[in-house]
Amino acid sequence: WCGWCPRGAVALAEMEATPNFIGIAVHNADPMAISSYDGSLGTYVPGGYPGGGVDRVLSGDPSDFSTMHASRVNDVVPCGVNSIAAFYDGTTNKISVSTEIEAFGEMSGDFRLSCVIVEDDLESTSSGWPQANYYAGGGSGTMTFPSNINGGYSFSTTNAQSVPAADFGGYDHVARSLSSNDILG
């Protein structure tokens, strides 16, 4: 339904090689949506889809990820994540995640960790999976994945207003599980 959302997918793909950037695609009104994440996202990223945010502090257009990330990446943080371990239990079909942080001095305030499990290469031919595409035919500008990602697929050179996920290599960075179903951690 979101014909401008290829801009978010391409922007996340462009950031993949950037150190210390973890991209998360939050979906809305499609089979990949997590209602608790989607419903609370406007707290940090106002303005609708596709929107972009960095560190729950900055928000803007996904095309500004690089600038937003650069303005935050060297900020002093109160702690660091030393380790993350994930364990899959095939019997229960659940993933358990544990982490260890290191505080860089005294910490006061309400600090929380939130874990988001993301998945790449999601495809389906079921209803709700094709990507609406307002960039079709190039009239709304160029919107193309980097050449080394998703085959450099271009949403602007196709004339398709609805693009099957398999055509562009599938959805990447998709939030699939949110710890405690709470964006606040």
Stretch-by-stretch model annotation:
Residues 10-11, 19-185:
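Short, conserved sequence motifs used for protein processing/export or organelle targeting and
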